[in-house]
């Protein structure tokens, strides 16, 4: 779809840590996180931790783990590996990372996300657990592939979908690109569950604390723009936009005037422009 810039009255000071952009009043403060730059990391099922900051290949307990310079780690095996506690891939804010699971399924994790997964899947189900946002390209099999979260489970056989489940967000979403998925939602206020079937182009949005499930047609290109290195927002609240940008660049964002968070924007921009340039463009788009 085409994204249009539209004007809104926004007066703000954007604090970048390396300089100031002055507007009439102080409304929004944005500063780099004080945490040092972090790389993605693996925690293996025996507790061993591996920083994914360089190319490597290692044989470990019957597995071959390969990490590339392109930001992707894969798990390969030639024989059955004894079942054990799951592994965890952690992706800090300010970065992204890809993972190839033992069945060939590819997962791309957005900033501030974790995925818990086994070294080798069992014969009854392929189960992983997501916190944050992940883009899944699932290898087809008669064994179901299940992505679990405390508020939403997604069950597939082979398909492509995007799931967003950050613990601090009020909504969990699943957007389907290809195939078919069954989405089961778990209310956080009682023990009720709701299940719906998605076909390509549909998105399930669930508010776990309200128990509200909604299914709508969406622009899947917009919903998965982050996979192409883009920010794409169509009629999205500024508060939500700044939360996403904050995660992507490890920024702390504070709205001194809460009303600004509700202003809706239409913005499309490449992520590699850097946060300073992106913030300038957002200012132009909003006032």
Feature roles, as predicted:
Residues 1-8, 18-287:
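A residue-level detector for the "anchor" residue at the start of short, highly conserved motifs
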Residues 11-14:
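Active-site-proximal cofactor/substrate-binding loop regions of enzyme domains
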């Amino acid at each position: 779809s085409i994204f249009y810039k539209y004007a809104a009255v926004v007066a703000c000071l954007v604090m970048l840590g390396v300089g100031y952009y002055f507007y009439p009043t102080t409304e929004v403060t944005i500063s780099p996180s004080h945490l040092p730059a972090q790389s993605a990391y693996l925690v293996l099922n025996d507790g061993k931790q591996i920083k994914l900051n360089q190319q490597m290949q290692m044989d470990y307990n019957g597995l071959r783990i390969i990490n590339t310079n392109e930001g992707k780690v894969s798990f390969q095996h030639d024989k059955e590996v004894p079942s054990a506690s799951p592994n965890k891939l952690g992706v800090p804010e300010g970065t992204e990372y890809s993972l190839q699971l033992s069945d060939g399924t590819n997962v791309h994790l957005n900033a501030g996300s974790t995925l818990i997964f086994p070294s080798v899947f069992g014969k009854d189900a392929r189960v992983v657990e997501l916190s944050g946002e992940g883009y899944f390209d699932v290898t087809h099999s008669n064994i179901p592939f299940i992505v679990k979260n405390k508020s939403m489970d997604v069950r597939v056989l082979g398909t492509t979908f995007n799931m967003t489940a950050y613990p601090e967000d009020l909504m969990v979403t699943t957007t389907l690109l290809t195939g078919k998925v069954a989405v089961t939602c778990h209310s956080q206020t009682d023990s009720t569950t709701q299940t719906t079937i998605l076909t390509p182009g549909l998105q399930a949005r669930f508010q776990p604390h309200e128990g509200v499930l909604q299914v709508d047609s969406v622009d899947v290109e917009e919903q998965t723009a982050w996979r192409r290195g883009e920010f794409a927002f169509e009629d999205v609240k500024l508060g939500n936009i700044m939360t996403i940008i904050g995660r992507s660049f490890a920024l702390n964002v504070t709205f001194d005037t809460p009303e600004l968070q509700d202003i809706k924007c239409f913005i499309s921009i490449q992520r590699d422009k850097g946060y300073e340039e992106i913030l300038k463009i957002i200012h132009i788009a909003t006032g």
